[in-house]
Amino acid sequence: HLKTYQSEDYYIHDKQFVIEGPLTYEDLKALTFDAHLTAFRDAEDQYEALLEITTLPEGRIYVARQDELIVGYVTFHYPDEIERWSTGNLPYLIELGAIEVSINFRQLHLAEKLIQLSLSTPEFEDYIVITTEYYWHWDLKNSKLDVFDYKKLM
């Protein structure tokens, strides 16, 4: 599985971020994980899940970080075996599994930058990328949006 590493410095509001990936297990392990990255599970368990994805042959983790602190990420991997779209074992079908930005770093366009960088490598031309969005992972409470307005935001 071809994985082309990319890195981009991003500046906004006098803050510098690095958007980079796909990261290896060792690269990811050398970074710290923001405690507010809890949309899917507690931060420590989510960090472990990301580390596990890096060990998959097709797994890709891209991060947004400030210094050594991961403040956002996006994951790509083959669909889970329990999902019906995995039944064909199509090597060109990859799932954007998760995207999350810490609450303290939202509205800085980091999610947009993560998507742009991660999908800009030539190898993604050979994939069909799918994603599923479940509203119970959305931050409706802190965004003060209802499901329909949050959907428009997405």
PLM-predicted stretches and their roles:
Residues 1-52, 56, 61-65:
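Short amphipathic alpha-helix that is part of the acyltransferase structural core
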Residues 40-94, 99:
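A conserved beta-strand-loop-helix scaffold within acyl/acetyltransferase catalytic domains
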Residues 43-48, 112-117, 146-153:
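Well-ordered, non-membrane alpha-helical segments in soluble/globular domains
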Residues 65-69, 120-125:
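Secondary-structure boundary elements
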Residues 89-96, 144-154:
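Glycine-rich, flexible loop segments associated with nucleotide phosphate handling
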Residues 99-104, 133:
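Short strand-loop junctions, especially beta-strand C-caps/beta-turns
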Residues 101, 107-121:
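Conserved acetyl-CoA-binding loop-helix of GNAT-fold acetyltransferases
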Residues 122-149:
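Conserved GNAT acetyl-CoA-binding A-motif
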